[in-house]
């Protein structure tokens, strides 16, 4: 498994924890890092922290995009795993220009298949692709 995939999977776990606990993001991140320091290798730490902090800071914007792009689903009703996977991918598409949007979407779909429900991959793919089109995010990629 690649470093970025590991960082994304750990970030998903941290964001899930934030969603359930509702405490201070800084305190929860410090506690998460303390509890899982053996799993947060130095090679993945910067990307992991960028994802967690970035998603936390951009959450209102990201959640608004998800609400506008998911038919009949409000973010609050989405499975916690799915919504946090999509939050990471949307953050990457909006704020990480070095990562092609198709990579962010594909990674999200694969992580959704691993950690979500049977339908998570298709749901995540549909919402993220709508957002990619809505925000005109292609960075020169060919369809």
Swiss-Prot record:
Q: Which GO terms describe its molecular function?
A: RNA binding
- Family statement: Belongs to the NusB family.
Q: Which domain of life is it from?
A: Bacteria
- List the protein's name: Transcription antitermination protein NusB
The record's Gene Ontology cellular component field reads: cytosol
Pfam families per record: NusB
The keyword Transcription belongs to this UniProt entry's keyword annotation:
yes
Give a GO biological-process term.
transcription antitermination
What are the protein's UniProt keywords? RNA-binding, Transcription, Transcription antitermination, Transcription regulation
| Task of the protein | Involved in transcription antitermination. Required for transcription of ribosomal RNA (rRNA) genes. Binds specifically to the boxA antiterminator sequence of the ribosomal RNA (rrn) operons.
Species of the source = Desulforapulum autotrophicum (strain ATCC 43914 / DSM 3382 / VKM B-1955 / HRM2)
Task: Determine if Transcription is one of this entry's keywords.
Answer: yes
């Amino acid at each position: 498994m690649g470093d970025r995939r590991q960082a994304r999977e750990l970030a998903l776990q941290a964001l899930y924890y934030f969603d359930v606990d509702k405490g201070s993001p800084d305190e929860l991140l410090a506690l998460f890092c303390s509890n899982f320091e053996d799993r947060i290798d130095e090679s993945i730490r910067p990307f992991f922290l960028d994802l967690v902090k970035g998603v936390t800071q951009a959450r209102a914007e990201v959640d608004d995009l998800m609400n506008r792009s998911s038919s009949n689903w409000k973010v609050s009703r989405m499975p916690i795993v799915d919504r946090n996977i999509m939050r990471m991918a949307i953050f990457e598409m909006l704020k990480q220009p070095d990562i092609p949007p198709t990579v962010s979407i594909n990674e999200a779909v694969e992580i959704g298949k691993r950690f979500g429900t049977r339908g998570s991959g298709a749901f995540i793919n549909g919402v993220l692709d709508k957002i990619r089109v809505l925000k005109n995010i292609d960075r020169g990629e060919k369809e």
